[in-house]
Each structure stands twice: as C-alpha cells, then as structure tokens.
Amino acid sequence: MPVLHASTNCGIGLGFNRMKGEVVFLYAFDVANEIISSRVHEILSAKPFPFEIRMDRTLPKDMPLYKPLAIEPPPLAASLHGAPVQPLIRIYDVGVVTVMMRAAFAAAAPGELMRFHNPQLESGLTLDAVALDFCAKVCDGLKDSLVGRTEFPPPPEAYTVFCLTDLDGAKDANAWLAEQRRDVAGLLTETAAEKLSEPQVNEVLRIQRSFENSDLVVIDWDAALVVDLTGYVDDVLYALELANLQLEEFRMMDQRLDKYLDRAYNDLERRPMPLFGAANKTLQHLRRFRVDVAKLTDEVTHITKFFGDWYLARVYLGARDRFYLDQWRASVEQRLAQLDKLYSVVHAEVNEQRMLWLEIIIVIFFALDLMILLCVKR
C-alpha cells in the first residue's frame, strides 16, 4: 500500500517526526504432550533461566507466578529492514516451544510499519523459517524431556505486536490513538486505512486496555498495538504470548480430535466388531486419548492462573476474547464428550458380544454334559 504520511496538523498524535519502538513476532509451536522441565539443563548449548516479569502495578500477595524456562540466543546474523533481530526462546510444560523475535524501528506514522507484515530478512530468509529452525534445534536437544512428541514440523501460530515506547513527545497514549485510530486499524489489519469502513475500524479497536494515560493495548486477530511510554512492554507481551500459546494448543487438540474421531467411527462401522485384539486396541487408544486431552485442556488453562496483576489479567481476558479461546475450549470439550460416548458404545458393544459368546459356550458345555450323561446311562 502507499506510505501514509503524518498530517501537518499540530494536534496530539499528528505532525510527529518520528515514533520509536520495536516490532515483536510471536511464534508458538506445539511439539509434545508435555515437556518435563526438571530434566532440561541446557537449551541450544545455553543454561536456561526461569523467565520473570516485572510487576509494577497492584497485585495480591502470595500469588503464584508461572515461570517458563527461557534462553536468549545471540542476535540473528541478518537484519530486518536494517535493524538487528533479537530472539528469545521459552519452553512450557504443556509441550509448547515459543520463539519471540524483536526488531527496533522508527517511523513517522503507523502506516510505515506495514512493511513488517510477512517479514523477510535481508538474507532472503523469512522469519517463519528462522523460527521453525530454532524450534527444530530446541526439540533435538530436548529429546529426553519430550513426552508424546508430535509430528514435526508443526504449523506455528504466529502473532505480530507493534510496540511503541516513544510518540515523539506525546504523553497521552489514549489521545494519540483517538487521532490515529484509522491508521492503527489499517496497520493491524494490513489494509490501506482509507479503504476501511467505519464499522470495521470500530471492530478492530474494540478490545482496548489502558492502565495509565501513558500506556494502552489494542488487540486484533492477527496483530496488536502496545504503547508504553515508560519503555517496559515485556509483561504485556507475556500475556499476549500465553493467549497465543493457548490458541495453538486448542487448535491442535481440536484437529487431533477430529482425525481420531473419524478413524474411530470407521472402526465402529466394521461388522462384526472383533472381541479381542483390535477391539482391545481401540479401547486402549480411546481411553489414553481421552485422558491426554483432558489433562492438556486443564494444564493449558492452568498456566494463566499466574495473573495476579489485575491489569495483565484484563489484557489476557481481552486477548482471550479476540482469539475466541472460550469457543475453542468448548469445541474441544464437545469432541471430548463425543469421545466419551464413543468409548461407551465400543465398550458396551464388545461386552454384549462377549456375553453372547459366553452364553453360547455355556449352552454348548451343557449340551456336551447332557450327551455324556446319556451315553453313560446307555
């Protein structure tokens, strides 16, 4: 799209010479059913450290914080639009590896940041490929810690966050957004601002969070805008990463359930149902899969209980709303209920057939006893 230039108007949010910040790319990879973090002593030849966020706002006491293991590799050899790219890798017990990559920028208007959508390094590699390579190397080093490793490579759930820490002198982030609302909506949807309808602009900006006048968060489906004039955005990025991680997990569970249910229905359509062997194998698979999915669903939800900071909780709830996480969870639970019914049907059918054959065997033995008795009397 054409570059959008800032207006010469002197109002808040207009006429800025330069906005400063960084663009952050979040990737979530579902690599296993579980990662046993207690066994992880090294990631990419580096000692991992528990990732912690700074809590500056009011929070309840004694609130447990989930701390995934993390490493910070050296910056990439190739730059992104002239800026170095700094990766950060985290591993989560629920079987997810996340790759975060950050690059600084300076721009005169939000529209100039459109170039960061679908990023490609100066070497020609895409960031998607770099993130996938990081994930593959991490998984190779975590072989003994991965439980139920998934087929590789899994498709990543990527999310882009535009972080602004300097609005060229503006101190009120919310007033700035009011002036730049259409350009921000165009940036987050990767669409020319002048093409967007007013209802679409309102929808893109619908989920906003702000604690002070110096900060705000706008969350859309594919990208988000984070403004914090204090310069610290890691806490909000962490909340968005967890929501993105949950979306990846629920999406993968939903796909696996669909495939497994299709196979299970095909097995049920076979007549007659074998009494042993395949029947026992089907029951074992159904039982194991039901337990695995129930456990994963609970653990994926559990990792967000760390939000003792009320503002971060509101940011996370906004992301959960935008990503439709409740609907994804409901879809998984619905398929889990179908799996329970299927398990009951298979179990009941196998038991009925076994009881029928048991009755036939009893009748046969009774007939044999009767024949033997008659032969003896003769």
Task: Place the predicted regions along the sequence by residue.
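Short Lys/Arg-enriched alpha/beta "domain-start" segment
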Residues: 4-215
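Short secondary-structure boundary segments
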Residues: 39-66, 232-251, 371-375
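N-proximal short alpha-helices
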Residues: 72, 79, 223-226, 230, ...
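Peripheral, non-transmembrane regulatory/ligand-interaction domains of membrane transport proteins
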Residues: 152-281, 285
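Membrane-associated alpha-helical segments
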Residues: 252-369, 376
